[in-house]
Amino acid sequence: MADIRNYTMNFGPQHPAAHGVLRLVMELDGEVIRRADPHIGLLHRATEKLAENKTYIQSVPYMDRLDYVSMMVNEHAYVMAIEKLLQIDVPIRAQYIRVMFDEITRILNHLLWLGAHALDVGAMTVFLYTFREREDLMDCYEAVSGARLHAAYYRPGGVYRDLPDSMPQYRSSAIHDEKTTTARNENRQGSLLDFIEDFTHRFPGYVDDYETLLTDNRIWKQRLVDIGVVSPDRAKALGFSGPMLRGSGVAWDLRKKQPYEVYDQVDFDIPVGVNGDCYDRYLVRIEEMRQSNYIIKQCIDWMRKNPGPVITSNFKVAPPPRLSMKQNMEEMIHHFKLFTEGMHVPRGEVYAAVEHPKGEFGIYIISDGANMPYRLKIRAPGFAHLAAMDEMARGHMIADLVAIIGTQDIVFGEIDR
């Protein structure tokens, strides 16, 4: 009798379900996966090395391009690390703005994850719905920073500027007549806070729509239940964090366990799974969107009652106001020095981590007292999750691999760095 031999197959890096440039070398027994070996590095851009040759402020835009779905949260970890080295305090209003935009970014990330995950598994409608909601949140990014994607809005010592008092308006065109344009501008007549508040009232209904389509859907459950099961102990041993860890039943969230900014001032719950499978991780992320919406509402209420500065008044760290800079020679010098030479950060080393939509995103900086980092290390949550791909996929069918890749919420910008 002839020996039964496994055969090897490549999955990606051009596969539509590979979520970027993932290449998996799979060993198959028929259609059953015996081994899945991830090959990474196809999106490596040497971000850590580039940061060693840029001033601290010049590296902020690089952070947006790591996980390019969760832009402002990447910036948050980076500026927090710099602030720890400088030992400066961030104005309380800036902290609330950061928390609010962290949660807007979390919803942005989870909406893209849900749409892409559902599309991979075969449910196309959800993808169209989630991108409708993402459009409103992208407009919030654009209102504060001028960019829909790579915002560079967080700065050491605070944020670039306060929230605007008006929203950009749609204009009528050959495609959209005046009546349609008026309807689209209906919720854009007030400030950015008014626009976000209107979104928070509408959003729970949208999440209900997603759940109506998916949560009790027989085919959705057949594709996700008991797929990619990871026990709590294995999840901790593998270095999981974020929804991947909470989906396995471990209630670990940096916003609660190691609170930063004003997370200890807002109320929210940590959703956790029971079985540690793809379906539990789906439920955890769905509930996280509801909790993020609740946090945003609390931030809006606080900011309406408490105006104030949004960046430190230390001109060695943050530029002086534009008007005074053009009227005062000393402030002009501060501005010139900051944007040419950059600020000199005290000697030392520091690690700052935030609860990223994908897990614990950390920045480790070693400073030698110069105006550039001596060494910058990025702790990407997706790296540990992708390393567990072999263990999660073993014994499953090829079709189940697509669900496992989706549940890991892989973005190669942060994994390859």
From Swiss-Prot:
Topology in the lipid bilayer: Peripheral membrane protein
UniProt keyword annotation of Translocase present: yes
Gene3D superfamilies: Cytochrome-c3 Hydrogenase, chain B
Principal subcellular localisation of the protein: membrane
Any GO MF annotation of the entry: NAD binding
Keyword Membrane (UniProt): yes
Catalytic activity: a quinone + NADH + 5 H(+)(in) = a quinol + NAD(+) + 4 H(+)(out)
GO CC field: plasma membrane
EC number(s) from the headed UniProt entry: 7.1.1.-
UniProtKB keywords: Cell inner membrane, Cell membrane, Membrane, NAD, Quinone, Translocase, Transport, Ubiquinone
Enzyme class: translocase
Coiled coil: none
Pfam family, one: Complex1_49kDa
Function in brief: NDH-1 shuttles electrons from NADH, via FMN and iron-sulfur (Fe-S) centers, to quinones in the respiratory chain. The immediate electron acceptor for the enzyme in this species is believed to be ubiquinone. Couples the redox reaction to proton translocation (for every two electrons transferred, four hydrogen ions are translocated across the cytoplasmic membrane), and thus conserves the redox energy in a proton gradient.
Binding partners and assembly: NDH-1 is composed of 14 different subunits. Subunits NuoB, C, D, E, F, and G constitute the peripheral sector of the complex.
UniProt protein name: NADH-quinone oxidoreductase subunit D
Organism the protein comes from: Nitrosomonas eutropha (strain DSM 101675 / C91 / Nm57)
